[in-house]
């Protein structure tokens, strides 16, 4: 998860936090399993041409707007943003679909560029007009940029469908848990196993993978008892594997994520906020998330909500 987490009570002691989700490599990697394994009817392709320009919202853009929205993204985070398509090199995901839909409402072209996650916010207003990369809304970020809320996400555990080992999300001591390297869950897994040891229970064996697809594959294949990931990632794993994976327990530490705009660009901020609200009101945003098998759509595009 790309945020500062609030840990569950089980893992509160000795926990470390990350300000964002990163991978070991700065290069984007495809998010779908190789050779089509585990594919399902999701994602449902989104056609941005079905979204029309709203003239009164487009008129809110700054007078010096050049006609193209440049969007900074970190294409390593399926199903939100990753490289996919027939060539495996096309920016894909619900955040990418959202960027295209915003462009349609605003009557603008959209250019999505990959960047290291930590480099996006410093480049807002210079290299990029917007950052749409699963940025959780935090006080630290609100001090630097404007953020428009659009989705809510948290952390989830996932197990093979039917929970064959009868696991309880409140006590995963003694299990083998898979996480993607560099995520918040990677750090939280250490805190979880430390809490088990403090309670005199068997530790969690944490297996780390550079690719989320590898985590999911090993869960389905039986090498893992449980997977720990962001809620959209877990939901996507469920549909990607044709229901071979299911959520265990509730979503934890859910928090809103926001579209990032430069603090001093009031006109662009207001235009993007209005465009986001339009997509919420007309059902397009819900349609995009439904197409990816993901929940968490917000109904109000709030500017700089309290974090």
Region spans (language model):
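Acidic, polar ligand-binding/catalytic clefts
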Residues: 109-170
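Ligand-binding clefts/hinges and TM-proximal coupling segments of bilobed small-molecule sensing domains
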Residues: 40-61, 187-206, 277-307
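Extracytoplasmic small-molecule ligand-binding "clamshell" domains
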Residues: 30-131
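Bacterial lipoprotein signal-peptidase II cleavage site
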Residues: 6, 18-33
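Extended ligand-binding regions for polar small-molecule ligands
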Residues: 22, 34-52, 96, 104, ...
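Bilobed "Venus flytrap"/periplasmic-binding protein-like clamshell domains
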Residues: 89-104, 135-137, 156-211, 226, ...
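Periplasmic-binding protein-like
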Residues: 152-159, 239-275, 294-307
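A ligand-binding cleft/hinge motif common to bilobed small-molecule-binding domains
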Residues: 119, 135-142, 190-191, 221-253
């Amino acid at each position: 998860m790309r945020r500062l987490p609030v840990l569950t009570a089980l893992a509160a002691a000795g926990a470390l936090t990350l300000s964002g989700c990163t991978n070991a490599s700065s290069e984007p990697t495809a998010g779908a399993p190789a050779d089509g394994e585990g594919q399902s009817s999701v994602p449902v392709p989104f056609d941005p041409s079905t979204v029309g320009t709203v003239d009164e919202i487009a008129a809110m853009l700054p007078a010096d707007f050049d006609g193209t929205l440049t969007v900074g993204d970190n294409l390593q985070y399926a199903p939100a943003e990753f490289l996919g398509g027939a060539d495996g090199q096309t920016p894909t995901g619900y955040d990418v679909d959202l960027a295209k839909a915003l462009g349609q409402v605003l009557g603008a072209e959209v250019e999505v560029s990959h960047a290291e996650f930590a480099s996006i916010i410093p480049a807002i207003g210079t290299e990029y007009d917007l950052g749409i990369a699963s940025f959780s809304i935090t006080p630290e970020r609100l001090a630097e940029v404007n953020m428009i809320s659009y989705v809510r996400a948290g952390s989830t555990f996932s197990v093979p469908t039917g929970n064959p080992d009868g696991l309880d999300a409140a006590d995963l001591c003694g299990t083998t848990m898979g996480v993607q390297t560099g995520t918040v869950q990677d750090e939280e897994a250490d805190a979880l196993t430390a809490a088990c040891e403090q309670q005199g229970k068997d530790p969690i064996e944490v297996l780390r993978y550079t690719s989320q697809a590898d985590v999911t594959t090993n869960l389905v294949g039986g090498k893992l008892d449980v997977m720990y990931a962001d809620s959209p990632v877990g939901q996507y794993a469920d549909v990607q594997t044709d229901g071979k994976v299911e959520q265990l327990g509730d979503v934890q530490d859910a928090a809103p994520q926001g579209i990032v705009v430069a603090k001093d660009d009031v006109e662009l901020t207001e235009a993007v906020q209005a465009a986001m609200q339009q997509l919420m009101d007309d059902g397009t945003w819900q349609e995009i998330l439904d197409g990816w098998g993901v929940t968490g759509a917000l109904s109000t595009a709030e500017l700089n909500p309290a974090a």
